[in-house]
Structure formats: structure tokens, C-alpha cells
Amino acid sequence: MLAPLPPCALEIRGLVKRFERPAVDGLDLAVRAGEFYALLGPNGAGKTTTLRMIAGLTRPDAGAIHVAGIDALADPVAAKRVMAWISDEPMIYDKLTPREYLEFVAGLWGVVPALAQMRAQELLDWLDLAAHADERCEGFSKGMRQKVALAGALVHDPQLIILDEPFTGLDAASARLIKDMLRQRVQAGCSVVMTTHILDVAERMADRIGVMAEGVLIAEGTLDELRRLEGSGHATLEDTFLALVAKSAVE
């Protein structure tokens, strides 16, 4: 007998968002608990718009979004309590130290002070920020700011992490720390949905990959499944991705 599938951390049905043209057009997508899902596509494919709708930053024109079983459109506050959003431009409070920022964010989510302090210290240690925990963030590099932003996103122990191009502009050491943290969270049962143009990162980290083009999900599966779909055998993700997008444009 097959083992039951883990529950859905994220379920999207019929998602639509229009600007001058449809940015997202009838998207269906599901991500299981403990799954790392990479959402890929060329510029303008609708990836960031999709993530912003999941995170509650952009309102869809139609469709449904459920996060850990919560209707994110009907009860966005409850949905945000179980997810984290991290953009490619880290937004933190420059006049606070990392420790102050983490405890402040934890307080916003209702984490009791003692637990907030414990989680903050764990994250500072894990992300190699402990030596700078009591320095103001205003002088930090982008890599350090991105680590502070990630720590702030994780301090309330979310079930779903949404990342939009998290490795853009990071040095190798910072990128490695963040990748290690994400792997640890997935192993603990958390789910990750990530967009990236760095395809070798998606190839190494993702359990499943979705490919978008012109607001539509044109392919989805493991790397081997995408290879079979495209007929490319043992091609890299980059080769497979480019072939799928080109085929979609012709069709």
C-alpha cells in the first residue's frame, strides 16, 4: 500500500491577476508539507505576482489560495501567521540591531518574550550573525541584511516560506548559509516556494519545479519528469527550462 501524501501547505486554484494584460491566468498549484518547490520562468512570466498574491501583498481578481488549510483571501491575518515572505530587496529597520529587530517581529506575531529571545538567539547563531547581534543594521552589507530579513521571517516558526529571488547579489558564503537554513527548515517539515533565475540552485535544492510563461504554468514535476516531458534525457535544468519555454512560445 502506498503511503499517504503529506497535507498541502499551499493550494492555489484558478488564480487570476490582470494588469494591462493577464499577469497570472488561471493558475493551479499545490505544494506539500516538507516540500521545496521552485517556480521558474522568464521575466514577465507572472512568478513574482503569484508570490505576492500568496503573501497577501496583491489581491487576485479571481481564484482561491489556501495556506495550511486556511483561506488566505477570507482570513489573510491567520494565513500570514503561518507563512513568511522574503523579497529580493530585504526590508528591515536600519536603526534596530538584529537582536532588537527579531524580538520586535516576534512580538508582532504574539510570540511570548522568553520564546522570542530564545528563537532570536538560535537564528543569530545559525546565520552567523551573533557577532553583530547588537550592532545597528544600517551599516550592513546586502548579504547580512538578507540574513537578518530571513531570520525575521522565521522567528515565528512559519509552516510556509515564500522567497522571491533570495540569492540575487549575495556572496557565496551568505548564499550557502541561507541555503543550509532552508534545507534544515524543509527537513523539519516546513515548505518552501522560491523563484530564482539561478537555475543550478533550483536544480540542486528543489523537490519539484514549476515553469511559468505568460501567466500560465506550462510544466511541473521533478527534474527527471521535466526532462521526460521535454524529451531531453539527461539535460541540465537550464537546457530543459529553455526548451520548455521555447516550445510554449511556438504553441
Which sequence ranges carry the predicted segments?
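Helix-to-loop junction immediately C-terminal to a conserved catalytic motif
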Residues: 55
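Conserved catalytic motifs of ABC-family nucleotide-binding domains
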Residues: 157
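Catalytic Walker B motif of ABC-type/P-loop ATPase nucleotide-binding domains
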Residues: 161-165
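Conserved ABC ATPase "signature" region
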Residues: 103, 107, 114-132
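ABC ATPase "signature
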Residues: 220-221
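Conserved ABC transporter NBD signature motif
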Residues: 63-74, 78-79
